[in-house]
Amino acid sequence: TADGYTVAALAVVNSVGSPIDPDTGLPWHIGRWTAPSLSSTGLRRLRDLLVAAPGSSLNTTIGLVATDAPLNKAQCGKMADVAHDGLARAIRPAHSMNDGDCVFAVATGTSPTTFPVSTDPSTDLPIGAVNRLLTAAADVFAESCTGAILTATSIGGPPAYQDFARKQSRSGGGPGTSH
C-alpha cells in the first residue's frame, strides 16, 4: 500500500458463477493478467459450456488475504469481508445459493512501517491506512481469482480455461499478487 504494507491473496475457484464474460471469452476482471487468446472455435466451445453449465450444490470459492500490517481482530474480519468485493468483481454472479464462498484474513504485524503515535503505542492504525489496506484486499483477491482461472489445468471433468486457449501467457501479477 502507499503506507508501506504488503497485502497478498490466494484463491481456489470452483464457483457456480462464471469468471468469464461469455461475449468476449475474457475474464470479467482481467487486472494485470494477459489472457490467452481464444480461437473462434474455442470461444464458441466456451460459450456453449457456459450456457449449458448447470452448477451443482458443491461449489465454492475459498481464499486467504494476508498482510504484514498490525491489524486487530476486528480489522482482520473487515479485511476478509471486503475481499468478497474482489470476488464479486471477478465472478458473476457471486455468492449464489449454491456457493459456499469464504475468505479468511491474517495479519502478521511484521512490517517495519510505523506511524507516529502521540499517546499510546498500542493505538490502532490510522483509519486512512486501514481503508487503503481494505482497498488492496479487494484488489488482490480479484486478481487472485482471475489468476486461479487462467493458470488452472484440467484433471478430468469440466475443462479449464486453458483448454479453450491457443497459448497461456501472463504479464505481472499472479495468484499471489500483492500491493
Language model: regions and residue ranges:
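A structural signal for small-residue-enriched, beta-sheet-centric alpha/beta enzyme cores
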Residues: 1-179
